[in-house]
Regions:
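Non-transmembrane, aqueous-exposed alpha-helical and coiled segments at domain scale
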Residues: 1-312, 406-408
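Short, solvent-exposed amphipathic alpha-helical segments in soluble enzyme
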Residues: 162, 204-208, 275-279, 292-294, ...
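Feature captures the catalytic cores and cofactor-binding loops of soluble hydro-lyases/lyases
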Residues: 208, 212-252, 346-475
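C-terminal binding/interaction regions
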Residues: 252-260, 267-268, 281, 303, ...
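Short, structured beta-strand/loop micro-motifs enriched in basic residues and often containing a Trp
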Residues: 314-324
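Residue "hotspots" at secondary-structure boundaries inside conserved domains
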Residues: 327-330, 367
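Short, well-ordered loop/turn sites that connect or cap secondary structure elements
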Residues: 329-332, 338
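Short, charged beta-turn/beta-strand-edge "cap" motif at the junction between a beta-strand
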Residues: 337, 343-347, 483
Length: 507
């Protein structure tokens, strides 16, 4: 009989979530570096460079890979011979471990979980509760998988109830472009096929916990070995999704996915459920077993596991944002790399909602946005002598509904975020001769190092969603939508899809 002690289990959960906050899995590092080596689009290669450099910096400094340190997801396989030496339930122990991990002062993680999601949406302050999936299996061990999944990729999850005769590849290739770049490619696609709707979604999520092995599968196919249905489907989807030319951060390029994972399950004769969930550039998961001998001891990657890369945007144009004018903004073209210097404002979902409500009521805003740039970000709290914790961009499309009003009524000159903007937002940018700049998702620590001072200007009660003023030095961004409304996320993938030449570009 295996006895698992309460404190050993709690501490193992805590250590696991701290561990994955700053260590990429080695298989992800290896796969991304191989993609970097073959990438031909300079913009996409630049983005991957930032992600790889950021990854190594986070590992060396034990700070989060991404400012969105995710919602905690835990898969448990509990052996039937396991006995618990505990006063708390398994769910309570998991949540205590998550609480410790996210509130540890040595590496504070961002609390992103909100209670009462349909109502007040109040932050729980410690990132609990976790999402827990538990099964009872034979044996005397507890198998644990801990994953932290950010909102940018989770929000791009898809579920469809296909007809039995529908083609899975066609559905995936039709769906991927609708997901935009908010899931921070290059990453991994997890697909669940069969069962019931909720089973398909769970399989899609669980598939993402397995190691990247697409190259081994390619070698198996090349050897002439027989492939299973799911293996053949993985290879076909891997080739064709990358042939869409979406590329790193949606900038166009050769690699959009590093692997495609598939789990399936028997389903009803009338049904063909399919779910798809992407894993982002901040891929974070770890697996371990507890056998009663004590808490887990996780082995960190070696520094040598990371490629010896440096990030230096020598082609960037330095911009003094304190003296920014519409005339200067009008001179920028999509794809231009800029290095921002001066003071920028921040604000995301909750702040924008408040600001627009104030505008609707004719109230004076707490901040003057005239000729300013606003950065869509919710930073991690600083530790030690940091000015701010990791502070990468959040998905800009969530602010689309506010953009025209903000540009028209506040004098705002530009925005900084990640991913594409919708067609109506691009029109609003053109109508107001504004600009949208893109920072790299998955490079939060790199961005934080460019922030030299930080102070809250408005809505401090919103925590990470408050309006800050950051003073930045050489903060790297790319012009994603210029003052004419042209979007790099609309033009670049089509260009690279045509260049790859596997899937015809629709006119």
């Amino acid at each position: 009989m295996t006895v698992i002690k309460q404190e050993d289990f709690i501490q193992s959960i805590c250590d696991a979530f701290q561990f994955i906050s700053y260590y990429h899995p080695k298989d992800y590092i290896d796969a991304l570096y191989k993609a970097w080596q073959k990438e031909e689009n300079p913009a996409a290669k630049d983005a991957m460079t930032q992600i790889l450099v950021n990854s190594r910096m986070c590992a060396e400094n034990n700070r989060p890979i991404c400012q969105d340190t995710g919602i905690a997801t835990v898969f448990l396989k509990v052996g039937m011979d396991v006995q618990w030496d505990a006063d708390m339930s398994v769910e309570e122990m998991v949540n205590e471990g998550v609480r410790r991990a996210y509130t540890w002062e040595g590496n504070t993680l961002r609390a992103s979980v909100l209670a009462d999601p349909a109502g007040k949406r109040q932050n729980t302050k410690d990132n609990t509760p976790a999402v827990i999936h538990m099964s009872i299996v034979p044996g005397g061990k507890v198998e644990v998988t801990c994953a932290a999944k950010g909102g940018g990729s989770e929000n791009k999850s898809k579920l469809a109830m296909l007809n039995p005769s529908d083609n899975i590849v066609d559905w995936v290739l039709k769906t991927i472009p609708t997901m935009g770049a908010g899931w921070c490619p290059p990453g991994i696609l997890g697909i669940g096929i069969g069962g019931t709707p909720e089973k398909a979604v769970l399989m899609a999520k669980e598939s993402l916990m397995s190691h990247i092995d697409i190259q081994e599968l390619q070698e198996k196919a090349a050897s002439g070995a027989e492939l299973s249905t799911t293996e053949a489907l993985r290879l076909e989807l891997f080739e064709k999704v990358n042939a869409l030319g979406i590329g790193a951060q949606g900038l166009g390029g050769l690699t959009t996915v590093l692997d495609v994972k598939i789990l399936d399950y028997p389903t009803h004769a009338a049904s063909k459920p399919i779910a798809m969930i992407p894993n982002c550039a901040a891929t974070r998961h770890v697996e371990f077993e507890l056998d009663g001998s004590g808490p887990v001891e996780l082995t960190p990657p070696r520094v040598e596991d990371w490629p010896d890369l440096t990030y230096s945007p020598d082609n960037g144009k330095r911009v003094d944002v304190d003296k920014l004018t519409k005339e200067e903004v009008a001179s920028w073209k999509t794809g231009d790399v800029l290095l921002l210097n001066g003071k920028i404002l921040t604000g995301r979902d909750a702040a924008h909602k408040r600001l627009v409500n104030m505008l609707d009521k004719g109230e004076e805003l707490p901040v003057d946005f005239t000729n300013r740039l606003i950065y869509y970000v919710g930073p991690v709290d600083p530790v030690g002598d940091e000015v701010v914790g990791p502070a990468g961009p959040t998905t800009a499309t969530r602010m689309d509904k506010f953009t025209r009003q903000m540009l028209k009524q506040t004098g705002l000159l530009g925005m900084i975020g990640k991913s594409e903007r919708g067609a109506a937002t691009c029109e609003a940018i053109a109508d107001n001769k504004a600009v949208y700049l893109m920072a790299v998702g998955g490079a939060a620590y790199v961005v934080a190092k460019a922030i030299k001072s930080s102070k809250v200007l408005a809505f401090p009660e919103l925590g990470m969603e408050a309006v800050y003023e950051f003073e930045v030095k050489d903060m790297p961004v790319t012009v994603a939508v210029d003052s004419k409304g042209e979007s790099i996320h609309a033009t670049a993938p089509r260009k690279w899809q045509a260049k790859i030449g596997i899937i015809p570009v629709e006119s």
